[in-house]
Swiss-Prot record:
GO terms for biological process: ergosterol biosynthetic process; farnesyl diphosphate metabolic process; isoprenoid biosynthetic process via mevalonate. It comes from Candida glabrata (strain ATCC 2001 / BCRC 20586 / JCM 3761 / NBRC 0622 / NRRL Y-65 / CBS 138). The chain crosses the membrane at residues 181-201, 294-314. It catalyses: 2 (2E,6E)-farnesyl diphosphate + NADPH + H(+) = squalene + 2 diphosphate + NADP(+); 2 (2E,6E)-farnesyl diphosphate + NADH + H(+) = squalene + 2 diphosphate + NAD(+). Signal peptide: none annotated. The keyword Lipid biosynthesis applies. Pathway: Terpene metabolism; lanosterol biosynthesis; lanosterol from farnesyl diphosphate: step 1/3. Belongs to the phytoene/squalene synthase family. It is a multi-pass membrane protein. Its EC number is 2.5.1.21. One of its GO terms (molecular function) is squalene synthase [NAD(P)H] activity. This is Squalene synthase. It is found in: Endoplasmic reticulum membrane.
Length: 443
């Protein structure tokens, strides 16, 4: 009932939800996801573990759909081992370190998870996933195995790191390193897969600054989640906020839960948001380098969700008490409006300006925050250069040329969006006429 009321109070979001549900069509047919019982079961497992990820994976180009589905399930299985506190640490470390080698088998499975672990089925039915993994092109298998090995060993290292287990994340450098292992590596693997498929520019993975770009894609998402999950993580007896930042505002991380320390907690949240915003320019550069439309949407949707979530947690004391989320209708609106690069940039600008407007002058990082937002705004100006005086030619910078290339693909998307708007407006007109007729003839 709450979600329905939310939509009713936000008519533009209601419009977006209806368009997404009834009007918008996927780019590709999904019939081939049921080609065999084994493949169909893998997609069922995907839906069981994450409906949101399943939705975006299902809309991918057939060349990458099964690849990324298998990649996700393998990393989910790895994460399910790492997350389960009932598994003996020695056994857990062994399984994590050897996980990539299990991909060479056809029948390995693991039933050592707690029976209450909701995702244990991914491990008990792992042979099903292995069957689909071995059907992938060798170059795709190689990427998945490499990332699985790096991530498994990274997880094992953190389990054995007594200082981390006792004191949590200490420095901003440690914070970035932790986010690298849990999210940056995913960005690494996905980027290589996209480039191998020919769906992104070659320099996206092999360029001089490519590591920084795909690393930022992962870190921006992970840092957003870490900021948002403060209360939930503390309830679970853990936290990933870096001490280098939070110690500027409190003696203990739990101090922020005391109502008298709320303002200090909010100042810390804003500082962490500022840290996350340092990745935005890289994120926009990365998105400018994706050509194939379904891959673009796959990459863009989580990023626009992240900037919307950052705006939600920004200057928000509720974060200290509970997990805050963006509205369902907002999510629908973001999905529809992030199908073009210009649409994504508009979303980023909207939320950046919203945060800037709400930033209190008394905030300890007021000046730094404004400088960071100004840097991003200036970069966006360089991306498009569409407000130049008459007679002035745009500077052909690297990002400008990337954007011009991406805009060629955007022009193919715009007619599709316009057609959806037309169909929705026609449907709305029909419904309105029917209701009006009903009212007129029954009066």
């Amino acid at each position: 009932m709450g979600k329905v009321l939310d939509l009713a109070l936000h008519p533009l979001e209601l419009r977006a939800a209806l368009k997404l549900k009834f009007i918008r069509q996927p780019l590709f047919s999904t019939n081939d996801t049921r080609a065999t019982p084994q493949l169909e079961r893998c997609y069922e497992l995907l839906n069981l573990t994450s409906r949101s990820f399943a939705a975006v994976i299902m809309e991918l180009h057939p060349e990458l759909r099964n690849v990324i589905m298998v990649f996700y399930l393998i990393l989910r299985a790895l994460d399910t081992v790492e997350d389960d506190m009932t598994i003996d640490p020695q056994l857990k470390v062994k399984v994590l370190r050897e996980f990539d080698s299990k991909l060479d088998t056809t029948d390995w499975s693991f039933d050592g998870n707690d029976l209450k672990e909701k995702d244990r089925v991914v491990l008990t039915e792992f042979p099903c996933i292995l069957g689909e993994y071995h059907k992938l092109k060798p170059e795709y298998q190689k990427v998945i195995k490499r990332i699985t090995g790096l991530m498994g060993n990274g997880m094992a290292d953190y389990i054995l790191d007594e200082n981390f287990n006792l004191n949590g994340v200490q420095t901003v450098k440690d914070y970035d390193k932790y986010c690298h292992y849990v999210a940056g590596l995913v960005g690494d693997g996905l980027t290589e897969l996209i480039v191998l498929a020919g769906f992104g520019s070659d320099d996206l993975y092999h360029g001089k600054n490519s590591f920084q770009l795909y690393e930022s894609m992962g870190l921006f998402l992970q840092k957003t989640n870490i900021i948002r999950d403060y209360a939930e993580d503390l309830d679970d007896g853990r936290s990933f906020w870096p001490k280098e930042i939070w110690s500027e505002y409190a003696t203990k991380l739990t101090d922020f839960r005391d109502p008298k320390n709320t303002q200090k907690g909010v100042d810390c949240i804003n500082h962490l948001v500022l840290n996350a915003l340092t990745h935005v320019i890289d994120v926009l550069t990365y998105l400018s380098s994706i050509h194939e439309q379904s891959s673009f949407q796959f990459c863009a949707i989580p990023q626009v969700m992240a900037i919307a979530t950052l705006a939600k947690v920004f200057n928000n004391p509720e974060v200290l008490r509970k997990n805050v989320k963006i509205r369902k209708g907002t999510t629908c609106d973001l999905i529809l409006n992030s199908r073009t690069l210009k649409g994504c940039v508009d979303i980023f600008q909207y939320y950046l300006r919203d945060m800037k407007q709400r930033l209190p002058v008394e905030d300890p990082n007021y000046l730094k925050f404004n400088i960071q937002v100004a840097k991003i705004e200036q970069f966006i100006e360089e991306m498009f250069q569409d407000n130049l005086p008459a007679g002035v030619e745009p500077r052909e910078t690297m990002i400008y040329l990337k954007v011009q290339e991406r805009l060629k693909w955007d022009t193919q998307v715009i007619p599709r969006v316009q057609e959806e708007d037309y169909k929705f407006n026609m449907a709305l007109s029909v419904v309105f006429c029917v209701l009006l007729s009903f009212y007129f003839f029954t009066k």
